[in-house]
Amino acid sequence: MTRYLVTWKAVNARQPEKIEDRVKQDLKFMETIQDALKSGALKDYGIAPDGMKGYAIFEGTETAGAMMTQMYVPFYEFEETTMLTADQWVEVLKNL
């Protein structure tokens, strides 16, 4: 399986203006994140103290990754980077 580092940031213009609405939305989103962590779909997740940016480690196919991130669009923007394990990188280096 391919491993991805997914960084994300909130789109300010798409965030609810009222704090009560923001809390409700964020709690709903966090339920899906916690479910993905429990199921193993996400390997790790972190969020900055301001709640406006963070990261996730996802392992799977490109399609599964797209399906996971699309549920948060247009509220968040994502950048995905394919990651190699240490062993994979050693293999690359040995074949240079």
Describe these PLM feature segments.
Residues 1-53, 63, 84-96:
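Short S/T/G/P-rich N-terminal loop/turn motif that feeds into the first structured element of a domain
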Residues 52-55, 77:
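Short active-site oxyanion
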Residues 58-64:
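Helix N-cap motif at beta-to-alpha junctions
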Residues 72-80:
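A common structural junction motif
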